[in-house]
Amino acid sequence: MWFGRDVISARDFSREDLYELFEMAKYMEKFAKSRVDFLRGKVMATAFFEPSTRTRLSFEVAMKRLGGDVIGFGSAEGTSVEKGETLADTIRMLDAYADVIVIRHKYEGAAKLAAEVAESPVVNGGDGAYNHPTQAMLDVYTIWREFGHVDGLNVGLMGDLRNARTINSLVETLANFNVRLYFISPEFLRPRAETVDYARDKGVKMSFHTNVEEVVHELDVLYVVRIQKERFLDPLEYERVKGSYRVTLELLKNAKRGLIVLHPLPRVDEIDHRIDSTPHAKYFIQAALGVPLRMALIYLILSPP
């Protein structure tokens, strides 16, 4: 049951919830380039205190495709926040205008606070370095759509697994399924202990690797996030490490024929651009599916069963 629910953490949603969302997203794909009146008269407020391109635009397009209206802001600049207004007061004002609120914020816990203040449902569009539940739902939807199932797949997660909020939410979402996870990163950029412990407690099999070459032949999915330069004190060490976590044509020679490569975008140089034209590249499809997935999410939240 999705009606009236907040979407704050990936941990709040079951396997059954996800399948219901995926089936609705598949249905919504036929309307992703048109306009319907499913949510005519409804208003979505976007409160993006942190920059975003794909998440904000896909939510806005999704609401407009459903026949609803959008208000809000893509930056705190020019809003009352600059005058010192608290997050809680900003949310209270948006709550008075809208039927659903989508928030992105640099501080972890901001979406939870918004949900406590607002009477309307609140959707977390990314807060702090930990939560990005709708991106994870999109990622797993892409996997489900490509393979027809999620159970039984070997999923590799590569790059800065500690500081990418997409990784935390993705691991927690995949924990609903019978998958094997391969964490591929420098040791000091392994995922947070609480994320690993959560998945392990749910029975997920996993292993840790510093070299992608040793496991690429086993993978069905390779999910890539960038190595963040700002995490390194030594620029030379960054360059050395970064080069070890790139997806190249040479690497994929040893991959399964059906391997798919995903990336939450934007990418820097962690995926060779020549891979874009190969059957492995699914990251642009993944981004495009953000609209029907979020159409389904908004529709389920705002529509009584």
Curated annotation (Swiss-Prot):
Its EC number is: 2.1.3.2
Q: Which reaction is recorded as catalysed by this protein?
A: carbamoyl phosphate + L-aspartate = N-carbamoyl-L-aspartate + phosphate + H(+)
**Gene3D superfamilies associated with the record:** Aspartate/ornithine carbamoyltransferase
Ligand binding (carbamoyl phosphate): R54, T55, R104, H132, Q135, L265, P266
Residues involved in L-aspartate binding: K83, R165, R226
Task: Give the highest taxon in the source lineage.
Answer: Archaea
EC main class here is transferase
The answer to whether the entry has keyword Cell inner membrane is no
What Pfam families would the database entry show? OTCace, OTCace_N
Q: In which pathway does it act?
A: Pyrimidine metabolism; UMP biosynthesis via de novo pathway; (S)-dihydroorotate from bicarbonate: step 2/3
- UniProt-listed GO biological process terms: 'de novo' pyrimidine nucleobase biosynthetic process; 'de novo' UMP biosynthetic process; amino acid metabolic process
- Key word Zinc present: no
Q: Which UniProt keywords apply?
A: Pyrimidine biosynthesis, Transferase
Which GO-annotated molecular functions does the record name? amino acid binding; aspartate carbamoyltransferase activity
Assembly, per entry = Heterooligomer of catalytic and regulatory chains.
Q: What's this protein's family per the entry? A: Belongs to the aspartate/ornithine carbamoyltransferase superfamily. ATCase family.
| Protein purpose | Catalyzes the condensation of carbamoyl phosphate and aspartate to form carbamoyl aspartate and inorganic phosphate, the committed step in the de novo pyrimidine nucleotide biosynthesis pathway.
Q: What is this protein called?
A: Aspartate carbamoyltransferase catalytic subunit
According to its UniProt entry, this protein's organism is Pyrobaculum calidifontis (strain DSM 21063 / JCM 11548 / VA1)
